[in-house]
């Protein structure tokens, strides 16, 4: 099976739900204190996730306004920055790390906000004929095991091949926020299903009618996690979607192409041990920072700080 060398990150959204913080800052560049105690933009966490899973090249879909800032962030240290920093060792360590990451990165500009499907289609030349990993740029991934979320997905892909999406268990009152799917369990591979249906942000009634899974508790569904493995077939489906003008609220949806893949090829989904936190909304951003804090260098101090304030009692 072909080893996966490339990943794409979609980071061209306007971040309207995080306004006014995103007025001059791309939402994927919102800062978070990572588990190692270093403050980084969310986008860097995803690039590091990919590289640590063995990915060699990362294509980032950006908008025209954010491209220069993102490229500069992953660029070389400037003389002015060197003068500002007192801790020279930390400065050069982090600057060197950023430059190494930057050497793996290619930016791809989405000139108009035409949706996630359109953003993925723009990466066709970068990806070529290879299978690739796709990330949502406004998600922070936090593994609950020693292997990161991407490593878990790639281990499953080594058994399944084809198209593979990571999924998470989601209560029915939240399915309207996510692409939701169902399918048939695969007996020989735990926590993996053969996908038979995908619905973009279904109502509770739609989910109950067509997306129930016998292996899940009542009122719980599989929703997309934020990591997909695609083959070049996805571009054929996206091209058809775009050519036919199949939009939802003026945008080309990725799930439209994914539904086509379900009908024409092998499509799998796997439940992994971890969580994906959506920093595109205030609550998700706050949850991401708390989760990273509790899993990282400052965990003891953070827990002590919370206990001093009466824990989580309302």
What is the predicted function of each stretch?
Residues 43, 123, 138, 181, ...:
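Residue-level signal for inorganic ion chemistry
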Residues 37, 112-116, 172-174, 204-207, ...:
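A short acidic, often aromatic-flanked loop/helix-cap motif at beta-alpha or helix-coil junctions
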Residues 49, 53, 122-126, 152, ...:
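A generic secondary-structure signal
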Residues 142-228, 232, 236:
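Conserved core of the sugar-phosphate nucleotidyltransferase
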Residues 1-20, 34-134, 141-145:
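Conserved N-terminal catalytic core of the sugar/cofactor nucleotidyltransferase
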Residues 4, 183, 207-314:
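Conserved alpha/beta core of the MobA/IspD/sugar-nucleotide pyrophosphorylase nucleotidyltransferase superfamily
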Residues 29, 107, 163-165, 267-269, ...:
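Conserved beta-strand scaffold positions in the cores of enzyme catalytic domains, especially
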């Amino acid at each position: 099976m072909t080893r996966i060398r490339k990943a794409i990150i979609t980071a061209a959204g306007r971040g309207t739900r995080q306004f006014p913080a995103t007025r001059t800052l791309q939402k994927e560049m919102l800062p978070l204190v990572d588990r190692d105690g270093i403050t980084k933009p969310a986008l860097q966490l995803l690039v590091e996730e990919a590289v640590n899973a063995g990915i060699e090249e990362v294509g980032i879909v950006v908008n025209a306004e954010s491209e220069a800032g993102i490229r500069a962030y992953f660029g070389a240290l400037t003389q002015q920055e060197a003068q500002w920093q007192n801790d020279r060792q930390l400065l050069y360590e982090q600057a060197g790390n950023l430059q190494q990451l930057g050497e793996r990165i290619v930016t791809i500009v989405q000139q108009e906000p035409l949706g996630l499907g359109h953003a993925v289609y723009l990466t066709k030349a970068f990806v070529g004929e290879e299978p690739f990993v796709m990330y949502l740029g406004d998600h922070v991934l936090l593994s609950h095991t020693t292997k990161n979320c991407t490593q878990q997905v790639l281990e499953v892909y080594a058994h399944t091949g084809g198209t593979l999406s990571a999924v998470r268990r989601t209560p029915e009152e939240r399915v309207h926020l996510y692409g939701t799917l169902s399918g048939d369990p695969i007996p020989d591979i735990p926590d993996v299903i053969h996908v038979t249906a995908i619905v973009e942000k279904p109502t509770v009634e739609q989910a109950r009618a067509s997306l129930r899974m016998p292996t899940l508790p009542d009122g719980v569904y599989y929703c997309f996690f934020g990591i997909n493995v695609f083959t070049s077939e996805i571009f054929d489906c996206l091209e058809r979607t775009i050519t036919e003008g199949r939009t939802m609220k003026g945008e080309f949806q990725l799930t439209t192409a994914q539904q086509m893949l379900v009908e024409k090829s092998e499509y799998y989904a796997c439940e992994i041990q971890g969580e994906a936190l959506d920093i595109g909304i205030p609550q998700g951003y706050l949850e991401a920072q708390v989760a990273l804090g509790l899993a990282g260098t400052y965990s003891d101090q953070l827990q002590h700080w919370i206990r001093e304030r009466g824990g989580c009692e309302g």
